[in-house]
From Swiss-Prot:
EC number(s) given by UniProt: 2.1.3.2
UniProt key word Transferase: yes
Binding site for L-aspartate: 89, 172, 226
Catalyses which reaction(s): carbamoyl phosphate + L-aspartate = N-carbamoyl-L-aspartate + phosphate + H(+)
Record bears the keyword Transferase: yes
Organism: Paramagnetospirillum magneticum (strain ATCC 700264 / AMB-1)
Gene name of the record: pyrB
Name of the protein in its database record: Aspartate carbamoyltransferase catalytic subunit
Subunit structure: Heterododecamer (2C3:3R2) of six catalytic PyrB chains organized as two trimers (C3), and six regulatory PyrI chains organized as three dimers (R2).
Pathway: Pyrimidine metabolism; UMP biosynthesis via de novo pathway; (S)-dihydroorotate from bicarbonate: step 2/3
Amino acid sequence: MTDAAFPHRHLLGIQGLAPSEITSLLDLAEGYVEQNRSSDKRKNLLRGRTVINLFYENSTRTRTSFELAGKRLGADVINMQSAGSSVQKGETLIDTAMTLNAMHLDVLVVRHPDSGAVKLLSEKVNCAVINGGDGSHEHPTQALLDALTIRRRKGKLSGLNVAICGDVRHSRVARSNIYLLNAMGAHVRLIGPRTLLPSGLDRMGVEVFHDMRKGLADVDVIMMLRIQNERMSGNFIPSIREYFHFFGLDREKLGIAKPDAVIMHPGPMNRGVEIDSDVADDVERSLIRSQVEMGVAVRMACLDMLTRDLTRSEGAV
């Protein structure tokens, strides 16, 4: 495993990370993949340290994998959700952060529905903070696990054509992946109806397609995104049936991509909406289960890096 230092106090986003820093995290995660596949999954690297997962939104994959990551590194892990906490009694995010800070924890993993909330919280605590997803802003560990998944299958990130398809407008996963893939030299395409693509894409270094068949031509990786109804106010698509017809991934559309193109999805999937079960469960080309596996290793790497007793810069990314 790498001994490289991570020069940031927090991991709040991918934007601003240097390619070398991304590579260091991925290289470290590689070692944890092999550890997790062994009979002895536990390593007491974080023995005596405390990790709190503070989630203001529901989560299965992210929260569970952070819990596993912390426990496999020997940390004391506490899961907190807004339901059943003082948040329901009117406590503010900052008050909650300062309360937890007084308990001398080492790492705080936060998911929050408001973009920028995690950065605000990070300015009020002494511990390391990891962004577990904030609104439509960023989800850095998802982008890192996606990158590791791609790199293990394709052997590289640079030069690959990656299509991100679906509800990009409301997706923090899409934003973090765009930042990471651009930084690592991949070519990013965004595919979706105009209503589900954000403004300002010309500044993000991506190609935009409103025709999925044209957008999938010659791609190496297809990332499908679900429609995030919980972040919508109003109707963004005419109907589920029509959306699947034009923008759902099925066997016919998959055939337009390269013969060895792989399929990814951050989950949860809406089968029959953005992806057909036939391709989602393709044992040769679907990497969806591999993404889940890589998630634990990547989050172990992030916890490892952020808790090393090394001199860190005061700036946070």
